[in-house]
């Protein structure tokens, strides 16, 4: 069975918990391991379970250090109110893809919040 593709199909129905279970099986079988870990983490973002997404993003990054992986990791840290780590990972994402306007906006928002904060 192609767990990764099945997980993608389930993800598209927004059944994120079932998709996570299938992505986990895909990752265990080394079936597009980085993509499986990344997509699992994105499912956790949809479920607003950012703390569960963070280690999955780190594991995916260890296998494939892509800009979008760092961007979503930074987003999770921002949602967990960890501004220093969010800024670090947004900057890393932007270093890998300096044409990403969303990343630039996120960095500017974080920097602005530092200037406003008491």
Predicted region positions:
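Short coil turns that delineate tetratricopeptide repeat
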Residues: 31, 64-65, 98
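Register position in tetratricopeptide repeats
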Residues: 12-13, 46, 79-80, 109-116
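Conserved structural position within tetratricopeptide repeats
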Residues: 24-28, 45, 58-62, 94-95
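Start-of-helix register in tetratricopeptide repeats
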Residues: 1-2, 35, 68-69, 102
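Canonical tetratricopeptide repeat
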Residues: 5, 39, 72, 106-109
């Amino acid at each position: 069975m192609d767990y990764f593709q099945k997980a993608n199909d389930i993800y598209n129905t927004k059944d994120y918990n079932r998709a996570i279970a299938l992505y986990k099986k895909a990752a265990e079988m080394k079936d597009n391991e980085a993509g499986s870990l990344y997509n699992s983490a994105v499912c956790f973002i949809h479920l607003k379970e950012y703390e569960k997404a963070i280690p999955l993003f780190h594991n995916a990054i260890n296998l494939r250090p892509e800009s979008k992986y760092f961007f979503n990791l930074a987003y999770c840290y921002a949602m967990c109110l960890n501004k220093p780590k969010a800024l670090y990972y947004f900057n890393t994402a932007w270093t890998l893809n300096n044409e990403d306007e969303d990343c630039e906006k996120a960095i500017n928002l974080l920097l602005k919040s530092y200037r406003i904060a008491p």
